Amino acid sequence: KYHNPHFIGNRSVITHLMEWKYDDIGDECERFLGPYGYGGVQVSPVNEHAILDRRPWYERYQPVSYDIRTRSGDEQQFRRMVKRCNKAGVRIYVDIVLNHMTGAQSGKGTNGHHYDGNTLQYPGVPFGPNDFHGHESCPTQDLEIHDYTNPKEARNCRLSGLRDLKQQSEYVRQKQVDFLNHLIDIGVAGFRSDASTHQWPDDLRSIYSRLHNLNKEFFPENSQPFIYHETIYYGGNGINSNEYTSLGRIIEFRFYKEITNVFRGNNPLHWLKNFGTEWGLVPSGDALVMIDSHDLRVGHTGKLGFNINCFEGRLLKAATAFMLAWNYGVPRVMSSYFWNQIIKDGKDVNDWVGPPSDKNGNILSVHPNPDMTCNHEWICEHRWREIYNMVKFRMIAGQEPVHNWWDNGDYQIAFSRGNRAFIAINLQKNQQNLQQKLHTGLPAGTYCDIISGNLIDNKCTGKSIHVDKNGQADVYVGHDEFDAFVAYHIGARIVS
């Protein structure tokens, strides 16, 4: 029901433009995301939130009201962005925080509303003490979650001190329904549901059952919102991400975990031959997948040193390329900003650092440079050639199955997607090149490697490859090359 992302045409990839301003996202939809084939943007939470010391990124995950006003802009700017992006063929998915309000502090939110997390007063909604879980429903002494595998505790107690809303209450549900319907009426395509694991599936079902159909100005009649859930599997039998697959897709954390394990060199690459449901993952149609996220990059989920983020560009590009080449789930590409990563005792002491901003905390605008990089400290992974060209690869591969699998029994693999696209990856540990005559599945001709370059005016700015009449080619990926993979598709054929 809530599984369709409503991509336009054969677009198939979402990017998370973390903490970008709405005006900048609108520009990016028109100037880059639309033309380069991205299907949608996940935007950071849009509702009024707490203003915390030092302005950390996670203040956006501490709601104060459901008014649309954040550091990214106000409701008018948000509406304009949604319209511009839809027109450019790019959908908008809003990160929604329904599980809780703020932490214990009191103060003012980004739309000027006062709140008090100690007395549980949020007049901007309004919510009061009766709208939160207390000792009557949370089994722990301090109202905090300690045992994440106990459903009652994980869903009725406080996640890291955040005030836990009583979603069994009709009043609370209706306030949340009104907020989501307001966003739907503006023209969003759906939502990332934050902390779904900590909300009862039946409460979410009740809320979703009242959602409007998507706005007919941008979507076909009777379209339902796309919803994908942050479901972190804590082990134990208590909570299972499968409880949420009737409510939308789940963010399949096992995908990130298994792929990272392989690309870190803990498991051989050739194991990925049957990667997917046979590994215990949910069916492809129930999954949204990622390599990196706003949490993973700083170790708020997973482990630092294990997670792959923008500081390991070569590895991140290779793992992302596999994700985009493999026919599983809806992939999401992280787009982050620079922070000074300092790891002490397995923790990043700067894991709180917010987006590039001026001394008054105003987020700085993104102005891409002619070479596709971004200004200030915006990293813009979604603009890296290796990534945007793999977005195109996925578009061209469409629903074609994986064919022509080859591996060396270790850390070199290659496969095609039907007869439309082909990729080869070399992560061999002992400085070994991948040099092999392989079946590419491609029609005869000369192809431009879309990883080392682009095809511009029928000329390749990178390496090229010749495919013979049998679909075979001499494939080469040196162990010390800038990128650990090559990729070809029928849209990058050099016409002779």
Curated annotation (Swiss-Prot):
GO CC field: extracellular region
EC number: 3.2.1.1
Keywords, alphabetical: Allergen, Calcium, Carbohydrate metabolism, Chloride, Disulfide bond, Glycosidase, Hydrolase, Metal-binding, Secreted
Subcellular localization, as worded in the UniProt entry: Secreted
Names of the cofactor(s): Ca(2+); chloride
Binding site residues for chloride: 192, 332
Activity regulation annotation text: Inhibited by alpha-amylase inhibitors from wheat and rye. The most effective inhibitors are the wheat tetrameric alpha-amylase inhibitor (WTAI) and the rye dimeric alpha-amylase inhibitor (RDAI-1). Not inhibited by alpha-amylase inhibitor from barley.
UniProt function note: Aids in the digestion of starch and glycogen derived from food, such as skin scales, fungi and bacteria.
Protein name in UniProt: Alpha-amylase
